[in-house]
């Protein structure tokens, strides 16, 4: 075998090996490209899912916020209606006069008088009820009309001797009744 043949065989072998390496390299490059494309697709898919999740979350938050605002607006409107009704009731109570006012005032004083022994008891009421109170208090021993108080009517009865103070004003009765019946009032007004 000649040297040229050996060189040629080595070259052929080197070319074959180079072709094999090139082929393996191209195959590996294709695998890397395929893997990179799959990873890129996965990244895009994940980004799309994340974007959809964020959009859904924002939509839910905005919807929740809108519902809360609507609920607050309804509650505010209801509160305003309840205040108007309360104010109307107060006005109607303040307008009670004549025999009805006297009967109510006497009844409230009777209830309060049970708490006192009759020693220097002062009865306070609305300033416009001074004459009415003078007439009613005359029927009670040890009771006298005191200074007027800011109220719709009724009486505030107190005694220094017993340190007892009974608030039987129309206002206090209204507030008690209002608080006790607020659910029912609300249900009737708003058909709940």
Swiss-Prot record:
Keywords: ATP synthesis, Cell membrane, Hydrogen ion transport, Ion transport, Membrane, Transport
A single MF term (Gene Ontology): proton-transporting ATP synthase activity, rotational mechanism
Ranges annotated as biased composition (Basic and acidic residues): 8-26, 50-66
KW Signal (keyword) present: no
Composition skew (Acidic residues), residue ranges: 27-49
Subcellular location: Cell membrane
Keyword Cell membrane found: yes
Entry superkingdom: Archaea
Region ranges (Disordered): 1-66
Gene3D superfamilies assigned to the protein according to its UniProt record, in alphabetical order: ATP synthase, E subunit, C-terminal, F1F0 ATP synthase subunit B, membrane domain
Membrane topology: Peripheral membrane protein
GO terms for biological process, alphabetical: proton motive force-driven plasma membrane ATP synthesis
Pfam families: vATP-synt_E
UniProt GO cellular component terms: plasma membrane; proton-transporting two-sector ATPase complex, catalytic domain
HAMAP family the record matches: ATP_synth_E_arch
Known function: Component of the A-type ATP synthase that produces ATP from ADP in the presence of a proton gradient across the membrane.
Family: Belongs to the V-ATPase E subunit family.
The protein's assembly and partners: Has multiple subunits with at least A(3), B(3), C, D, E, F, H, I and proteolipid K(x).
Protein name (record): A-type ATP synthase subunit E
Source organism of the structure: Natronomonas pharaonis (strain ATCC 35678 / DSM 2160 / CIP 103997 / JCM 8858 / NBRC 14720 / NCIMB 2260 / Gabara) (Halobacterium pharaonis)
Encoding gene, per UniProt annotation: atpE
